Regions:
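Cell-envelope/extracellular polymer assembly enzymes that use nucleotide-activated donors
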Residues: 2-5, 23, 33, 180
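Short beta-strand/loop segment that forms part of the nucleotide-sugar
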Residues: 8, 31-40, 60-65, 90
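Short, well-formed alpha-helical segments that are part of the catalytic scaffolds
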Residues: 12-26
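A conserved acidic beta->alpha catalytic loop
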Residues: 23, 30, 38-47, 68
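Glycine-rich, basic loop-to-helix element that forms the pyrophosphate-binding segment
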Residues: 64-80
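Donor-binding/catalytic cores of nucleotide-activated saccharide
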Residues: 69, 90-193, 203-218
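Short aromatic/hydrophobic "clamp" motif used to bind/position activated sugar donors
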Residues: 85
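Membrane-interface aromatic/basic loop that binds lipid-linked glycans or pyrophosphate carriers
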Residues: 262-303
Length: 303
């Protein structure tokens, strides 16, 4: 029976951690190892983790100095022994059948990745699909959908074969580490199978890593840099993706530059780098048919 490693970065999660870990221990797929990585918590999160390790031998607890979510995930990947890997954030929780369902789908369809739908809210609010829709996406289509960010690049609603992760690790980022990690492993994925069943639940809270920087400068800046990089790569390798990538690079660059202007930081390296990209591709940006007029006006005036 295949082993699934479930990786949970833990940081000051007193109010949510037990719900999270209980949902993993309650999985109908029982051959699990649960790696709880305490990332320098200042509350009693580590003690809660150790309590679970004493009760269930499948729980492995690690403690490290605070380094952020990517660092904690990478630490766990270095110690994981499973054939499959899943990721759950410490304030999220999952349906009892999530990993059994995804593992079965991946086995049936010989897929490298399995994905389910997610939702915000309570588990009892979930509505099961009357008939589960199964979608199998082959390598070329899957690559295009994620590379252009048409599909979300989250890792928490997915199950991965360990073999496709290999030595890949999460890059340090405040907002888009999942997106950057998925970009690294994209060329290795030959097939993904997904279901519309809602098996994963997430929480939005003020200090949630994935939400706290939403619609802020940091989010816009990191996405701008990422899409600029993808666009420049696509010019040589994937010309069919160029228009959408340039649209995203431009819109996020404009948002980040506006935020820097508001803070009177036009002389920073970040602003200068964003402006240089916009200048270099100004003609192509202004020719984009579906780029919002407000962005074109900003490019025309400020670049």
């Amino acid at each position: 029976m295949d082993k699934i490693s479930v990786i949970v970065p833990v940081w000051n999660a007193h109010d949510y951690l037990e719900r999270c870990v209980d949902s993993i221990l309650g999985q109908t797929y029982t051959n699990l190892e649960i790696l709880l990585v305490d990332d320098g918590s200042s509350d009693d999160s580590l003690a809660i983790c150790q309590k679970y390790a004493e009760k269930d031998e499948r729980v492995r607890v690690f403690h490290k100095e605070n380094g952020g979510q990517a660092s904690a995930r990478n630490y766990a990947l270095d110690h994981a022994t499973g054939d499959f890997v899943g990721f759950v954030d410490n304030d999220d929780w999952i349906m009892p059948t999530m990993y059994e369902r995804l593992h079965q789908l991946m086995t049936d369809y010989q897929a490298d990745v399995g994905r389910c739908d997610d939702m915000q809210g309570k588990m009892e609010d979930s509505v099961s699909a009357e008939k589960a829709d199964i979608l199998v996406t082959e390598a070329d289509e899957f690559f295009g959908l994620l590379y252009q960010d048409i599909w979300g690049g989250h890792v928490t609603d997915r199950l991965f074969r360990r073999s496709i992760i290999g030595d890949a690790r999460f890059p340090h980022s405040k907002t888009i580490e999942d997106m950057r990690f998925m970009r690294v492993i994209l060329p290795r994925i030959k097939r993904e199978v997904s279901t519309n069943e809602k098996l994963f639940f997430y929480t939005i809270r003020e200090n949630n890593t994935s939400m706290v920087y939403a619609r802020t400068y940091i989010n816009a800046y990191e996405r701008a840099v990422e899409f600029q990089s993808r666009y420049q790569e696509a010019l040589e390798k994937y010309p069919q993706y160029c228009n959408l990538l340039l649209k995203k690079a431009s819109s996020f660059s404009c948002s980040a530059m506006k935020a820097l202007i508001h803070e009177k930081k036009q002389k920073t390296q970040e602003y200068i780098a964003l402006r240089e990209f916009m200048r270099k591709y100004k003609k192509s940006i202004l020719m984009l048919e579906d780029l919002q007029l407000r962005y074109k006006l900003f490019v025309f005036a400020a670049v």
